């Protein structure tokens, strides 16, 4: 996009975050990154970042996930927009969050993520920003989608038995 834009009112920045659930054959996990920079340096968060001016939100979420963890996923589903004015201490930021289900794979921290790591869903560390709220909504949405067998959020092949096991894991968190 070319040109200068001048607005008479302040406007927010837009980020994307990706809640990635991973199944290892026994347990349901979630992928977190340890932040390498401020704000919340050293804290755990979901992979995500600022949307580029020339990309749509799902592509931005996939790009940030790949840059920060090395993980490529095909299917993601929009979870919602997180808009609390004070959610980011840097500036007014609106986050569009996505979620996906995949198999646990090797991940590595990259870009501004020092570490990428899978955590069991019932053993999460304290999360940066409003990511605890994001996690709770994503877990409920995952449970609902698995129960109803709806949505386009699965990246990978799972048997019906595995889907049932993952569904029951969402209920026992």
Task: Go through the PLM ranges and name each one.
Residues 1-4, 79-81:
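Short Pro/Gly-enriched beta-strand edge/turn motifs at strand-loop
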Residues 2, 24, 108-109, 150, ...:
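Feature targets compositionally biased, intrinsically disordered low-complexity regions
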Residues 2-45, 58, 73:
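N-terminal strand-loop-strand
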Residues 35, 48, 121:
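Active-site donor-binding loop signature of nucleotide-sugar glycosyltransferases
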Residues 147-173:
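Polybasic "coupling" helices that flank or enter modular domains
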């Amino acid at each position: 996009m070319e040109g200068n834009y001048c607005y008479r009112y302040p406007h927010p920045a837009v980020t994307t975050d990706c809640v990635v659930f991973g199944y290892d054959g026994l347990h349901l996990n979630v992928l977190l990154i340890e932040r390498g920079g401020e704000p919340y340096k050293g804290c755990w968060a979901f992979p995500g970042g600022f949307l580029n001016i020339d990309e749509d939100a799902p592509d931005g979420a996939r790009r940030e996930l790949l840059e920060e963890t090395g993980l490529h996923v095909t299917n993601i589903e929009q979870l919602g927009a997180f808009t609390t004015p004070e959610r980011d201490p840097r500036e007014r930021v609106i986050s569009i969050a996505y979620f996906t289900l995949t198999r646990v794979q090797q991940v590595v921290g990259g870009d501004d993520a020092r570490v990428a790591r899978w955590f069991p869903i019932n053993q999460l560390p304290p999360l940066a920003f409003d990511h605890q709220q994001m996690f709770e909504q994503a877990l409920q949405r995952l449970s609902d989608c698995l129960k109803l067998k709806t949505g386009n959020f699965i990246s990978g092949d799972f048997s019906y038995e595995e889907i049932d096991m993952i569904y029951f894991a969402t209920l026992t968190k």
